[in-house]
Each structure stands twice: as C-alpha cells, then as structure tokens.
Amino acid sequence: FEHSLEPRRVVSQAFAGGRAEAIEIEISSDSPVRGKKLREIGSDYYIVGALFRKSKVIIPHGDTEIQTGDLVTIVLQSGAFSNVINLFSGSESRFPLEFGKNILVVLENEENLKNLSESEFYTRNTKATSLSVLTREDLFDNNLESTDDTFKAILKDQEFEMHFKNKISTKDIESFVSDSSIGTIFYSVEEGMSKSKIKSLINISNKSNTPVLFSKSTYPYKTIGILINNDFGETSSNSVAFDLAASLSASLTAVNVSQPKFLQSEESSKVSDSIEKLQDLALSHEIQLDLENKEGNEAKIFSEMSNKFDLSVISTGTNQSWQSRKTVEFIAINSKSSVLYIPS
C-alpha cells in the first residue's frame, strides 16, 4: 500500500496540441532499464532525448548506458505514457492491490472445494493479504466433519474467514464486494453453467471494478494467455498479465485473431503498435513472450488455444461493444484454463 502511494519521480509536459508529451523520469535502483544501453530498449513510440547525470547534460546515443540517479528526458506519442512509465520507472508487482486487498471465494456446493486450493495458490502468489470464503451452510451432505476443519485441511496454514449463507445469490456476492476490500472474486465454473450466471458476475465485476476469476483448477500458472488489445493502462488486462507473469515467473502467450483479409481495416496498424508495446513490456519485465497469429472467430479460437495456458487474462479493453462482451462471456465458459477477467 505504501509502495502504491509513493509519489513517482516523474515530471510531464504535453505539447503539439496534446498529441505528444515530454517526460522526465529519475531512474531508481530497481528500474527495469537500469544498466541497459539505449539500443536495447529502443522503440518507435518514444525517444530518449537527454540524460542529466552528476550535474552534466548528456546527449545519448545507442551505446549510452542508463544508470541509477539519471534524470532521463523522453519524448513520446500521446497514449504511451503508462507504458513508458512502467518501462523506465519500474513497478514492483502489486496486483491485486489496485482493486482491493482480499480474495473472495464463493462456494455453492461440495464440488467447488477443488477450486479452494487454487484460491490458496493465488492468494500466496499475489499481493493479496487475506482470503474470505462465502459458503453455503449446508455445503456438505454427510456432515462427517466440520466445514471449518475441511477448509483448514485444504488451505493449510493460509488464514481465512468464513461467511455463511443459506443460499448464495448474485446480490449476496455484490453486497459482500461493496462492503469489503476485494481484489478478486473467485468463482468455480462447472459444466453446464448458465450464461446468465457468467453475465451477472461480469456485471458485478464492471460495476464494482473488481476482477473475477472463473476457476477451473488449472494452477500453478506457468503459462499465461492474453488476447492482444490496445489498452495499456495501469489496471488493464495487459498490465495485470505482466504483473502476474513477473511475480509467478510465468511465460506469456499473446494471441492476435484477425478477420479474413477482405474484412480487415486500419485495425492492423493498431495491432502492430500493441505488439511492439507488449514486446517492450516483456523486455522490461524480463518475461518470455510468445506471439500467436490466427484468423477467424476470436472467442472460439482463443478458447480452443486455452489448453496451452494455465491462466487466461481477458477484458473488453477500451472497446465496450456488444461483440467484445460476448467474446468475454464465451471465453469464460468455454476456456480450458482458469480465466481472470479484468474490468475496463
């Protein structure tokens, strides 16, 4: 929390009618670019114009190495601010603290217990501080052992709080999230689960700005899959995926599903720009990034490919269209891996 509040050592000035920006960043000891030469971090959407080091101005070239304490002046395209900040200033993994500090697991039947272990793994391997379990009172038919003892056996030494309901409604989940600091809602996806349930959870996620993980017990997360989009904000699915990959030492696979050539438009140039930004983020986080290009129906192809992933991270991005919402709903139901939905 203190890290999130720490003021960034960044000065910014827009020019060219807001189409460009000049920023000055002080390089910290944990910056991803510290010790790197400019030729290693070059990009088409920003340029390093000058360094101020030990009271001297340095006009940099490809072999100039960035050092701790440097004041770096960067000129960048509009919209690239957060990406450049992440690249140069460095950001310790902090997900899901941007959304909330606790994990909420919803258990509606005994079958959901297999997903409880995944929530324990998730809590331990993110910056979440505690685990809350919203469960039915009659979760077990036989009642041979107490619910508390069963949870303790599954969650090992992970601390948790139990909250009981006779029957868990969507309204109960929404109320719990609004009254607590929840960073992720964990919900088990079962075969035959209704689309309306998925839709309701996504609506809660968007309304409360709380990620929801549709759990399918595909942990540990060694490979994370994402759909390429052009949203690189601090709490975007792209940023969250890289945050998780860095903290879990996981690889990332970015999937671009294009329309047939005769239907393609200027979107192809946006995809190229997004790919370049993803490659820059992979370089700064030292994460293996694989790119997959496919053609056809985005939702179906990504769902089919998800057997290669342990976790899929998706969102509607900046495109809040009917089609993008349907894509998210389809993937949440049909993905072979657990799906983390990030609200936009």
Can you annotate each of these PLM segments?
Residues 92-145, 149, 225-268, 279-287, ...:
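Small/aliphatic-rich secondary-structure junction motif
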